[in-house]
């Protein structure tokens, strides 16, 4: 069959046509493949491998297309139970033996906790049975049969005091499984490992065990700097033959591992727990240089090349000091000196000068000075290259003054050294003393039952009336609308679980926990309501009230929750301009704990009761009863406590109600200053408010503290100073009269920017990059902060997972700045760079030269663990033990009460009664609820039983008007819309649900 060509009379066969199409397609595919391959040869923006573009492209393409990630989650320190293990029987080496036993138990428990199996190399006879590699080298090995098993797919390779004897680490690493080792890695060149002496000669450790054997072995540098290592990959005989053609052209299979170490044993600081986590398996050409940088494990060489017969070892202490241990080979005498001192002494011209300098530095021990002089004597000084054992970094920890903890227990990591020495501390949230002390300091000690005078009550009533405006017949949102607004993944998950139980009354119980965030004092308590039904049903009212009343035109000048950063910045600058910069910053001290039940009843509750239709009043009051008087227990520890009547941070009412209390205090102060003015005029003078943060006119600077005390509150007032900017919502406005540029509160940010609280199974590089990328969005132009973030991204970026991998984690945005998650970023303008820098200098008290030096240091850093910490002159730590002892004002007359509460709560199920407790603080309240559930439907205290009301509300799905499809809008006295000037918000810019705090 033939096909006619459109032009002309020529004809071609179908076969010829198909051949032509195939040829053209094949050529196109070849050209496409060549272009893709050629792209791998691109010139990188950083040092790259040698060779030509073709070899670079070849190596990069093979690595990229063959990389296989290995997912393993393992953190053995979660199973650490004691850092000072003891043995009952003393066999001559009781301490070191107890540490070894504890290490074996820790390893076994941590492997079992993640569902793995153990594959041990030459195990102890007392070790558990299982797969193993057991050769007979020591007499003790004869206690078990010879075995040479193959590790299982879920195996963890374990070695206890055996790694020194392996010929090369690849013997352990080639299986591409985690390796866990308990090893001896000394921080000094001789001395005692607990009760066993050791020396070093010819780079071999001579270790003598009292009541045991003597061992001579080298030491692998597991604890050296560098977090990634490479190894060969073990293959079966079948795989080896199948891969033979690939090996003939120079391809080899390589595995990469991340190496960790810690020194958890207090009595044996020279003992280390080392564990490696496999990361990737790749193929690469062994005859082409690779651009993946890893370190190579090697034996530690203790000999000082510049001083024959001497050993030298550098290490970093827990106090971030670089020390040098020096001593003769094979001798027990050794001394330790700061490296900077030894560097200085090494350059002196005479031994007399060395002695004089040592005495001048306070070293008067003859043995100490003699050892230094003996080390100095002899040859020309050359700076040696010696191994350095780096310490694993630990965040600064907040120790409660009543703590019984032996070691810090925090769920946080540092990804660099602190930027400032007075950095924030992490709370020990796993310790019940931390929870107990936070309850006392943030609830019990600040409980407020003050009842204001008649005059103050009248002012508050006027404020509520003006805040509500014309709205008197609101309807709550429907259940469907509320579910749609509660759009956080965790909320949606909980709502799906209880969707068929929405008609059930919510449970009355608070489960509280310490917030895992850095701070300078006792950690905050999150008082969460575990029953999502309570959150759902209260949110029906809070969301409707916020949408219609609080965001109405008459409140928009002062009510700021729900605005995006640009709207907040514009509003603040407009307010400051209207006041001619005569403004003050207000910040309440522990507003949540100090709000009284009177304020909640007569401001927040009254406002909602008067705004909604009468048929919803009972339901609103019942919810407020629950918030004020609900019983509480510690979620982690189980003990019950009196939560007080203050605001509960996990309630949907927290942010809107706190903002209302804030505004009411200022309205009271304005009334004090202008008693004859019309209330409507004073209401229009209220400044921006959001939670406990606020801005006010300077005319009330003296009266606002008096107004706060009338309600039993404490307030801190700062007058606007152009040199340090204006702070609102933790953002500093550098010059609100001229620009909307803001920066993150610099001192607060610098104190905590080096910390991450992400899950420890997430690689540190990933957590660091995720965290600083958020700050680079909100503070891309902020001096010092942006420079630090760029440094972290530059140094951690190459080792971090791909953006696709990081985006798949649900916790990706956990540590992003709050405002980045609210559909907006704060405005910053390049022309304000100098202003931002000057404000930062004033607020941090770091002079300009030091700021410039830090910025230069960040730009030049090649290792994230280089020392960058700026020494702060003062410490802001409170209620804790700091590095110098008890922090100022941390121990006072409250200490006996703290200790008493701690001892009482040590037994879960008991709680200390409080005389000022709420109405529902009976000691048997929780058990009573259990009895109620056993007898029939669960009923909240003080609420009418199900079915006793008119059936229109009472917390269940309501019929009629509440099941509508839209948000109601209030009507004015004449039937017209009262909010005609307010345009509907744009898509994606709606006021955010206020069920959580900022």
Swiss-Prot record:
GO molecular function, one term: RNA-directed RNA polymerase activity
Activity modulation comment: Drastically inhibited by phosphonoacetic acid. Only slightly inhibited by gliotoxin.
Region (Interaction with host mitochondria outer membrane): 1-67, 233-250
SUPFAM superfamilies the UniProt entry points to: DNA/RNA polymerases
EC number, as in UniProt: 2.7.7.48
Residue ranges, annotated region (Cytoplasmic): 35-998
Temperature dependence: Optimum temperature is 30 degrees Celsius.
Catalytic activity annotation: RNA(n) + a ribonucleoside 5'-triphosphate = RNA(n+1) + diphosphate
Region (Homomultimerization): 1-400, 700-800
Cell compartments where the protein resides: Host mitochondrion outer membrane
GO cellular component entries: host cell mitochondrial outer membrane; membrane
First-listed, main subcellular location of the protein, grouped into a coarse class: host cell
Annotated active site: 692 (for rdrp/tntase activity)
Superkingdom to which the source organism belongs: Viruses
Chain intervals for the UniProt region annotation (Capping): 91-282
Keyword list, A-Z: Host membrane, Host mitochondrion, Host mitochondrion outer membrane, Membrane, Multifunctional enzyme, Nucleotidyltransferase, RNA-directed RNA polymerase, Transferase, Transmembrane, Transmembrane helix
Residues that span the membrane, as ranges: 17-34
Binding partners and assembly: Homododecamer. Forms 2 stacked rings of 35-nm in diameter, arranged in a crown-like structure at the opening of virus-induced replication vesicles. Interacts with protein B2.
Note: The viral bipartite genome is composed of RNA1 and RNA2.
Free-text note on domains in this protein's UniProt record: The N-terminus is important for both membrane association and mitochondrial localization. It may also contain a RNA methyltransferase (MTase-GTase) capping domain. The C-terminus contains the RNA-dependent RNA polymerase domain and a structurally disordered region at the very end.
Name of the protein in its database record: RNA-directed RNA polymerase
Organism: Flock house virus (FHV)
């Amino acid at each position: 069959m033939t096909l006619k060509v459109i032009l002309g009379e020529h004809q071609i066969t179908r076969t010829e046509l198909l051949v032509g199409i195939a040829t053209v397609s094949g050529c196109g595919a070849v050209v496409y493949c060549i272009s893709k391959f050629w792209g791998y040869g691109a010139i990188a923006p950083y040092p790259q491998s040698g060779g030509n573009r073709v070899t670079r492209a070849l190596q990069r393409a093979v690595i990229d297309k063959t990389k296989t990630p290995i997912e393993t989650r393992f953190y053995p320190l979660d199973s650490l139970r004691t850092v000072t293990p003891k043995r009952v029987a003393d066999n001559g080496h009781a301490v070191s033996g107890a540490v070894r036993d504890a290490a074996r138990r820790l390893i076994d428990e941590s492997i079992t906790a993640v569902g793995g199996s153990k594959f041990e190399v030459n195990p102890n006879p007392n070790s558990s049975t299982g797969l193993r590699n057991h050769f007979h080298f020591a007499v003790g090995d004869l206690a078990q049969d010879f075995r040479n098993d193959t590790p299982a797919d879920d195996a963890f390779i374990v070695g206890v005091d055996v790694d020194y004897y392996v010929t090369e680490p690849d013997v352990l690493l080639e299986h591409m499984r985690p390796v866990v080792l308990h090893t001896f890695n000394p921080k000094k060149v001789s001395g005692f490992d607990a009760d066993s002496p050791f020396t070093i000669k010819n780079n071999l450790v001579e270790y003598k065990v009292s009541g045991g054997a003597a061992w001579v072995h080298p030491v692998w540098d597991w604890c050296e700097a560098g977090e990634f290592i490479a190894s060969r990959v073990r293959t079966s005989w079948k795989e080896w033959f199948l891969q033979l053609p690939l090996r003939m052209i120079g391809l080899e299979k390589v595995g990469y591992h991340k190496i960790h170490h810690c020194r958890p044993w207090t009595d044996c600081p020279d003992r280390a727990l080392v564990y490696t986590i496999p990361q990737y398996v790749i193929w690469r050409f062994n005859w082409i240089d690779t651009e993946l940088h890893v370190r190579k494990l090697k034996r530690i060489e203790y000999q000082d090349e510049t001083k024959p017969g001497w050993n030298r070892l550098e290490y970093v202490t827990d106090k971030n000091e670089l020390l040098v241990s020096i001593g003769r080979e094979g001798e027990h005498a050794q001394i330790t000196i700061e490296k900077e001192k030894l560097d200085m002494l090494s350059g002196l011209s005479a031994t007399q000068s060395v002695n004089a300098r040592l005495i001048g530095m306070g070293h008067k021990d003859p043995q100490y000075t003699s050892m230094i002089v003996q080390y100095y004597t002899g040859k020309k000084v050359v700076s040696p290259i010696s191994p350095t054992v780096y310490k694993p970094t630990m965040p600064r920890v907040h120790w409660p003054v009543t703590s019984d903890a032996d070691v810090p227990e925090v769920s946080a990591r540092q990804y660099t050294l602190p930027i400032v020495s007075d950095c924030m501390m992490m709370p020990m949230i796993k310790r019940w003393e931390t929870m107990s002390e936070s309850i006392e300091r943030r609830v019990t000690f600040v409980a407020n039952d003050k009842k204001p005078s008649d005059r103050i009550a009248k002012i508050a009533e006027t404020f509520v009336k003006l805040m509500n405006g014309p709205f008197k017949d609101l309807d709550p949102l429907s259940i469907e609308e509320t579910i749609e607004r509660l759009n956080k993944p965790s909320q949606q998950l909980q709502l799906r679980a209880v969707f068929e139980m929405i008609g059930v009354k919510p449970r009355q119980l608070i489960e509280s926990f310490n917030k895992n965030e850095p701070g300078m004092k006792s950690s905050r308590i999150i008082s969460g309501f575990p029953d999502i039904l309570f959150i759902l049903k209260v949110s029906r009212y809070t969301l409707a009230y916020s949408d219609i009343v609080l965001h109405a035109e008459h409140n928009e000048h002062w009510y700021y929750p729900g605005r995006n950063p640009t709207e907040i910045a514009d509003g603040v600058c407009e307010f400051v301009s209207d006041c001619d910069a005569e403004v003050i910053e207000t910040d309440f001290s522990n507003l949540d704990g100090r709000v009284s039940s009177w304020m909640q009843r007569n401001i927040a509750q009254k406002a909602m009761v008067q705004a909604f239709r009468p048929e919803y009043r009972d339901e609103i009051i019942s919810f407020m009863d629950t918030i004020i008087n609900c019983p509480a227990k510690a979620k982690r520890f189980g003990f019950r406590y009196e939560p007080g009547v203050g605001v509960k941070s996990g309630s949907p009412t927290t942010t809107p109600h706190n903002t209302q209390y804030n505004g009411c205090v200022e309205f009271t102060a304005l009334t004090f200053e202008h008693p004859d003015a019309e209330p409507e005029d004073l209401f229009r003078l209220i400044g921006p408010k959001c939670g406990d943060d606020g801005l006010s006119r300077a005319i009330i600077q003296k009266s606002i503290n008096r107004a706060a005390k009338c309600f039993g509150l404490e307030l801190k007032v700062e007058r606007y100073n152009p040199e340090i900017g204006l702070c609102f919502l933790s953002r500093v406005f550098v010059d609100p009269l001229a620009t909307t540029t803001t920066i993150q509160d610099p001192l607060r940010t610098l104190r905590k920017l080096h910390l991450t609280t992400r899950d420890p199974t997430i690689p540190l590089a990933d957590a660091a990059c995720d965290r600083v990328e958020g700050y680079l969005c909100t503070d891309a132009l902020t001096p010092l902060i942006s420079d630090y973030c760029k440094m972290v991204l530059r140094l951690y970026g190459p080792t971090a997972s791909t953006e696709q991998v990081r985006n798949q984690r649900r916790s990706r945005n956990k540590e992003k700045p709050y405002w980045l998650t609210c559909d907006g970023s704060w405005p910053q303008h390049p022309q304000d760079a100098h202003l931002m820098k000057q404000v930062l200098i004033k607020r941090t008290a770091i002079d300009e030269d030091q700021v410039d030096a830090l910025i230069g240091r960040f730009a030049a850093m090649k290792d994230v663990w280089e020392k960058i910490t700026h020494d702060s002159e003062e410490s802001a730590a409170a209620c804790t033990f700091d590095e110098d002892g008890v922090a100022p004002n941390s121990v006072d007359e409250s200490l006996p009460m703290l200790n008493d509460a701690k001892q009482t709560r040590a037994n879960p199920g008991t709680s200390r009664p409080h005389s000022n407790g709420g109405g529902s603080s009976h000691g048997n309240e929780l058990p009573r609820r259990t009895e109620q559930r056993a007898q029939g439907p669960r009923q909240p205290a003080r609420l009418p039983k199900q079915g006793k009301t008119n059936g229109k509300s009472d917390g269940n799905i309501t019929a009629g008007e509440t099941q509508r499809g839209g948000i109601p809008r209030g009507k004015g006295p004449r039937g017209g819309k009262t909010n005609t000037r307010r345009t509907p918000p744009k898509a994606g810019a709606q006021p955010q649900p206020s069920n959580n705090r900022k």
